[in-house]
């Protein structure tokens, strides 16, 4: 459903009492990019007088920003919409209006089907068109039911406001910043190319402007996001071709920006410039999420990953050569169609060789519309589950060993939020671990030197080593 971009600048509607004050509740499912998208939607809706709330009961608008990556994702959304239908009906009986919107990747995949199965829904907006959300809501208020999932011609980021400094400050000292969307890799298990579209990179100037505004508002650490973030490309100040490494060098020049991270990467796009950035940039944290999915060349080929296990291991060796302290994270799928016991053992061997600081692992789930769904030799669920249990036990063991190896180390800790105990603050280590420290004289946003003293279930403990830096 195409629209004139001029509609995006429509005047703000007023409530019956003459005010613009309304409440929006946004439920975010899935990845970090959805978290980022939810904040941008919230900022766009602020122009129309919507204030965010964490209480769904008081919301005039409820948005479900959805994820389609796992099996039964759509059914979970329909289940939530059933509960919202009852809430909407109850509010209507009390003389209160509530609008319901579905955004994100389930919205993109399901489209009109959502309106058919969930008649209480007013608006369905895809991830490439959520800049049109305010206008879609205006139309819904006039009685229309809106579905907008066609890929926009216009650059959505040009139509999205960046939040005021006070709102950025309230969100904390770390922030996400999407620099790339979509994927052209077409891994046979993945829905991303179908829900997020082809790879698109934001221009350098737009990224730098947003990063500078985040830092001006007090953000100390920025994580660059993309479905395939290291496929980002753009033009430098003289029109020269830039890759993600070049962008990181540029962002590292921003005064006050202490830390940089990026996720999620594909092994095929880890070029020399990006590896050099890991070597040279103090601001680029020694942590890399680099999914491999399997250690079997036969399964990697069936997944259309376009690299071998040996090539992945060689890449890891190159990165560790320039940044010996780097911590590695990965993604794994057990039970991909045709996976044999021997294939799975190859995965375990790769994990043993890499030694991950943390990793994410899942059973293969059939995604309608993907090539993997059409493959023969689907693996029985009980075998998928047994392999996943074995893999997760190994990964957990490695995670615990990495955490224990940190004991006694002095590190720079970015303080992010208060802890549970008086005087306690929680920060993130360079390797993305949560760290608890007694830091009464420090403030959130400080980077202090601490010494790791112990490990918890999902965190580390530390004592202060010296004054803030």
UniProtKB/Swiss-Prot annotation:
CDD domains: Radical_SAM. Residues 169-401 form the Radical SAM core domain. Binds 2 [4Fe-4S] clusters. One cluster is coordinated with 3 cysteines and an exchangeable S-adenosyl-L-methionine. Residues 22-142 form the MTTase N-terminal domain. [4Fe-4S] cluster 2 binds at residues 183, 187, 190. Its cofactor is [4Fe-4S] cluster. It is found in: Cytoplasm. [4Fe-4S] cluster 1 binds at residues 31, 67, 105. It holds the Pfam family TRAM. It catalyses: N(6)-dimethylallyladenosine(37) in tRNA + (sulfur carrier)-SH + AH2 + 2 S-adenosyl-L-methionine = 2-methylsulfanyl-N(6)-dimethylallyladenosine(37) in tRNA + (sulfur carrier)-H + 5'-deoxyadenosine + L-methionine + A + S-adenosyl-L-homocysteine + 2 H(+). Its main location: cytoplasm. GO terms for molecular function: 4 iron, 4 sulfur cluster binding; metal ion binding; N6-isopentenyladenosine methylthiotransferase activity. GO terms for cellular component: cytosol. The keyword Ligase does not apply. Catalyzes the methylthiolation of N6-(dimethylallyl)adenosine (i(6)A), leading to the formation of 2-methylthio-N6-(dimethylallyl)adenosine (ms(2)i(6)A) at position 37 in tRNAs that read codons beginning with uridine. This is tRNA-2-methylthio-N(6)-dimethylallyladenosine synthase. It comes from Rhizobium etli (strain CIAT 652). The gene is miaB.
């Amino acid at each position: 459903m195409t629209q004139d971009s001029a509609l995006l600048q429509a005047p703000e509607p007023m409530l019956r009492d003459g005010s613009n004050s309304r409440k929006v509740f946004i439920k975010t499912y899935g990845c970090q990019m959805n978290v980022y998208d939810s904040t941008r939607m919230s900022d766009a809706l602020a122009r129309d007088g919507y204030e965010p709330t964490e209480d769904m009961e008081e919301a005039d608008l409820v948005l479900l920003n959805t994820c389609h990556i796992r099996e039964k994702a759509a059914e979970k959304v329909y289940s939530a919409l059933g509960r919202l239908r009852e809430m909407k009906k109850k509010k209507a009986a009390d003389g209160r209006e509530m609008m319901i919107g579905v955004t994100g990747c389930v919205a993109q995949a399901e489209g009109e089907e959502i309106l058919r199965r969930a008649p209480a829904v007013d608006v369905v907006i895809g991830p490439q068109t959520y800049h049109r959300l305010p206008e879609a809501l205006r139309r819904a208020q006039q009685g229309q039911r809106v579905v907008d999932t066609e890929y926009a011609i216009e650059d959505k980021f040009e139509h999205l406001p960046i939040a005021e400094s006070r709102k950025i400050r309230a969100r904390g000292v770390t922030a996400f910043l999407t620099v790339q969307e979509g994927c052209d890799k077409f891994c046979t298990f993945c829905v991303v190319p179908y829900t997020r579209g082809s790879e698109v990179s934001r221009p350098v100037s737009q990224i730098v402007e947003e990063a500078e505004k985040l830092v001006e508002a007090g953000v100390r650490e920025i994580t660059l996001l993309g479905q395939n973030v290291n496929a980002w490309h753009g033009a430098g100040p003289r029109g020269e071709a830039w890759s993600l490494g070049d962008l990181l060098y540029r962002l590292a020049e921003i005064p006050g920006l202490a830390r940089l991270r990026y996720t999620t990467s594909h092994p095929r796009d880890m070029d020399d410039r990006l590896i050099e950035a890991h070597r040279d940039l103090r601001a680029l944290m020694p942590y890399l999420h680099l999914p491999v999915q399997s250690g079997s060349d036969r399964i990697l080929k069936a997944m259309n990953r376009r690299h071998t296990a040996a090539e992945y291991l060689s890449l890891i060796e190159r990165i560790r050569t320039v940044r010996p302290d780097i911590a590695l994270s990965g993604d794994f799928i057990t039970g991909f169609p045709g996976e044999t016991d021997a294939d799975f053992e190859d995965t375990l061997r790769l994990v043993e060789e890499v030694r991950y600081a943390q990793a994410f692992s899942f059973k293969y789930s059939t995604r309608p519309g993907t090539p993997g769904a059409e493959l023969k030799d689907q693996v029985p669920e009980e075998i998928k589950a047994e392999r996943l249990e074995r893999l997760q036990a190994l990964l957990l063991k490695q995670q615990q060993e990495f955490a224990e190896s940190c004991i006694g180390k002095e590190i720079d800790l970015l303080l992010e939020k208060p802890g549970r105990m008086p005087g306690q603050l929680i920060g993130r280590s360079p390797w993305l671990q949560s760290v608890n420290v007694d830091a009464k004289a420090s403030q959130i946003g400080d980077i202090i030197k601490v010494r790791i003293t112990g490990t918890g279930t999902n965190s580390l403990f530390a004592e202060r080593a010296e004054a803030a830096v």
